[in-house]
Structure formats: C-alpha cells, structure tokens
A protein has these predicted regions:
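Short, conserved sequence motifs used for protein processing/export or organelle targeting and
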Residues: 1-170
Length: 170
C-alpha cells in the first residue's frame, strides 16, 4: 500500500508530509517527564547495553522498549509516489533505521510497579549478539517509554554503539 507516516504512534501524518511538518514539531515541543540514557559497549560481536529511565511524573504504568536498528542498507525499493521522479522502482535505495531486533516485547516490557513514580530511576541491562552479516558501524540502539495504557511515546532516545549518555530530562 501507500506509505503512511504516524506521528507519535497516534495520528496519521497528513499528506503531503513535507507540507505538514508542524504536526511533528508540535509534538517535539511538548515537555517530556521521562528521561532516558543508553550506554553500550562492544566486545567482538557481543553488545552490552544499559538503559536508564528517570521518571518525573506519577504514572500508573510504564513500558520500556529497546530496539536494534541498522542504517545504510542498500536494496531496491518500490515507489508508489511522485517523489524521486515517480519511477516505480528505486534502484539501490539506501534504507535507514531498519529494525533488526527488538530486545523487549515489540510494544515494550512493563516496568516493575516499585520503579514507577515521581523521581524514580529504573535501569535494565541487555546483551545482544550482532550477526556477522550486520555492519556494526551502522548499528544503533533506540529506547523509548510508553504509558501502559496507550502506544504513545513519552520519550525516545537513540545511541550509536559505544555512546555514553547521561539522562536528559526537562
């Protein structure tokens, strides 16, 4: 079907998307009450990840999702739009942010109740064996937090392998 953008997993991004960037920037301007940090290290093909969630509001439930994604995958891409000259197949198209693995349930794992509440900190470690066919220099880690009651993202953070992040919270 026709490619569709979803803003914050809630609303369809109005077509044509380049003319409606305000839908996205309005969401980005909202205050985040969740802080995230991703720290990782690599030993051979073994990736160790530490994800931290700092909570600045009294939520009832929260879920954390952690994904492994890869950039710069080159494959042909069907084109159903007038973009790129309207050709039907984009040869050697460079794909970014391709989901390679979900280290949690795809919709996130629920945080323990004792870790949900104002000024609480939750921390979880993950390990992942990167398949030899993947390009380690193109791998990124994405973590996001949702309320247990919806799929809306409260905050999201991405990191390259080896990044050391501190929690950023407004």
């Amino acid at each position: 079907g026709f490619p569709t953008g979803i803003v914050n997993r809630e609303a369809t991004w109005t077509y044509p998307q380049p003319d409606n960037v305000g839908q996205v920037t309005a969401k980005l301007a909202q205050k985040a009450y969740i802080g995230l940090a991703i720290n990782s290290s690599l030993d051979g093909n073994n990736l160790s990840i530490n994800a931290k969630v700092k909570i600045g509001y009294n939520y009832n439930t929260l879920k954390l999702a952690v994904y492994i994604i890869e950039d710069n995958l080159v494959y042909d891409q069907e084109n159903y739009t007038s973009y790129y000259g309207g050709v039907s197949v984009l040869k050697n198209f460079k794909h970014h942010n391709v989901l390679r693995e979900s280290l949690t349930n795809i919709l996130g794992d629920q945080l323990p109740n004792e870790n949900v509440g104002h000024d609480k900190l939750f921390e979880r470690n993950f390990t992942y064996s990167i398949p030899p066919a993947y390009n380690k220099s193109n791998i990124k880690i994405v973590a996001f937090v949702t309320p247990g009651s919806s799929k809306a993202v409260l905050n999201v953070r991405g990191a390259k392998i080896g990044d050391e992040q501190s929690i950023e919270q407004k």
